[in-house]
Curated annotation (Swiss-Prot):
Organism domain of life: Eukaryota
GO cellular component: cell projection; GABA-ergic synapse; postsynaptic membrane; presynaptic active zone membrane; presynaptic membrane; receptor complex
Subunit structure: Interacts as a tetramer with GABBR1 and GABBR2.
GO biological process, one term: regulation of G protein-coupled receptor signaling pathway
Name of the protein described by the UniProt record: BTB/POZ domain-containing protein KCTD12
InterPro entries (UniProt xref): BTB/POZ_dom, H1_KCTD12, SKP1/BTB/POZ_sf, T1-type_BTB
Gene (name only): Kctd12
An annotated Gene Ontology molecular function: G protein-coupled neurotransmitter receptor activity involved in regulation of postsynaptic membrane potential
SMART domains assigned: BTB (SM00225)
Bias kind Gly residues: ranges: 11-21
Organism: Mus musculus
Amino acid sequence: MALADSARGLPNGGGGGGGSGSSSSSAEPPLFPDIVELNVGGQVYVTRRCTVVSVPDSLLWRMFTQQQPQELARDSKGRFFLDRDGFFFRYILDYLRDLQLVLPDYFPERSRLQREAEYFELPELVRRLGAPQQPGPGPPPPHSRRGVHKEGSLGDELLPLGYAEPEPQEGASAGAPSPTLELASRSPSGGAAGPLLTPSQSLDGSRRSGYITIGYRGSYTIGRDAQADAKFRRVARITVCGKTSLAKEVFGDTLNESRDPDRPPERYTSRYYLKFNFLEQAFDKLSESGFHMVACSSTGTCAFASSTDQSEDKIWTSYTEYVFCRE
């Protein structure tokens, strides 16, 4: 009897096989941890498992309820990987928390977010994003330094500063031309105006304001060789500093994020650089996105040389930064 009693308490002992089997199955740990780390297109999100499975029959619900952890793709650090747009996933995750859709004012990429919602199989979110927008009766946005927002106009364009819409005069006929249209059709110099808006002149309300600084380290020629032999500009790498979301918006796939891959969209970084070495190409991309240069600086240094001749091109180096702003 003593042997049987001792055997009943052992994990592999006999006699109590039925009871031990049921207790061991109930004591098994869950397949997924309560805290889940997701790598969505290079952006890292940390949330609870109950949040990602809050919508039944969605893609995330099937991933974390119907599959085994070893069946899901992971990155080098063991986080579950999703090959989707990491910037838009923040709105997907925010919706999963309380099933409410909250978007910032002047959100221009509803169609892209709707496509992400379709991928994650969230039909209610897709329906809300596809519903027509009802403009609010609130006051027009405040004046900006580069222009005045004209509410209710086609495309929500910005009128140049000094061309604000005047108050309607009493007794004016309904068919009379608007003074604002007359002002907008003339340039400040009195000539015929070209296109009213370009990205480098004024910004629509959907664009985020901010600063981006690009810099490069190069070399230049000084001395007698500068006249005798032309030396072309040498740019080894163009660095990008600023808010992560702005840098990705401007440079897109030409931005190398390998030095700072897990930076959230609203954080700042100084470790990005471009995949090309042409300054003018970077300037074009910034101009197309509505940025304009507000400052620049450059420094030149001469490395130590054993000889007194400092006219060699490799001795002299420079570092230059350009600061761009969008309002």
